């Protein structure tokens, strides 16, 4: 689901390249849209690709540093928390939410996840290191965090949040 027709249009060729066939993008008006309400408690997995400052992409988009401010990041964190809360309602017991951004800011990543876990004690943080190890990928830490200077990629963050069965 997304509120942006442009992002949904951009998603279609990316899905085709990925080989995924079980993804059905759909437009919604907001995180309380009736399409989402119908799925409450029924979904196995939700990926929250949260709108963010994009500061993890500075090496490709250096002008971003001039377009972001403390106020704009503060506005984004409110939106991120609301979207993550809405995603949590979709997941069945035993299901999973993955929260991801292309930001390096603690305010958009760790702080959002930590506040979410306080608001939603029915969820636990599953260490990314364990999930990645099952795929043969060595990684330390509770979160997946890609850093441009270490991994030669854009900056990226992901947290795995499992709903207790």
Question: Where are these predicted regions, by residue range?
Answer:
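S-adenosylmethionine
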Residues: 1-165
